[in-house]
C-alpha cells in the first residue's frame, strides 16, 4: 500500500482527470503517525521512514512533489493534494528519530512551499489561490 501511494508521485497520474490521487499518501501518513504515537511499533515506524524517503525521492529539481505535471499544475485537486503531502511529511517529522531524515524533510517542505509561494498569489505571473480549483466555488 505504501509503495503504491508513493509511486503516484513518479508520474503525472492526475493530469488526465485532474484527480486527487496525490492526497492519499499524506492522509495515510497522518493517521499512521498517530497510530505509531500510540503503539510505538518499530516495524510501523520503519515502514513510515522508508515511505518518507521514497516520497522525498520523487521531488523534482524545482522543488515540486505533485501528481500533476508542471503544464497541468494548480488546477483540479493539485493544491489540495500538495497540502496533504506537506501535512504527511510534517506529521512524520514530529515523530522522526533520525536527524538527517528530519533535515531532509525540512529542506523538502521549504522547497515545496517556496515553489508554491512563487506561483500562487496576487503578483505578476502568479495564479490567484481562488483560481487553483473549480471545486467548492474556487
Language-model features, listed with the residues they occupy:
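Glycan-recognition and catalytic cores of secretory/periplasmic carbohydrate-active enzymes
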Residues: 1-138
Amino acid at each position: 500500500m505504501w509503495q503504491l501511494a508513493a509511486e503516484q508521485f513518479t508520474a503525472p497520474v492526475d493530469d488526465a482527470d485532474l484527480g486527487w490521487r496525490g492526497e492519499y499518501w499524506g492522509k495515510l501518513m497522518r493517521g499512521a503517525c498517530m497510530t505509531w504515537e500510540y503503539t510505538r511499533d518499530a516495524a510501523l515506524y520503519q515502514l513510515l521512514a522508508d515511505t518518507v524517503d521514497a516520497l522525498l525521492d520523487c521531488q523534482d529539481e524545482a522543488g515540486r512533489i505533485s501528481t500533476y505535471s508542471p503544464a497541468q499544475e494548480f488546477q483540479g485537486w493539485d493544491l489540495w493534494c500538495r497540502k496533504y503531502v506537506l501535512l504527511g511529511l510534517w506529521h512524520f517529522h514530529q515523530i522522526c528519530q533520525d536527524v538527517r531524515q528530519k533535515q531532509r524533510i525540512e529542506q523538502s517542505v521549504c522547497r515545496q512551499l517556496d515553489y508554491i509561494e512563487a506561483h500562487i498569489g496576487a503578483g505578476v505571473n502568479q495564479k490567484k489561490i481562488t483560481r487553483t480549483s473549480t471545486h467548492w466555488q474556487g
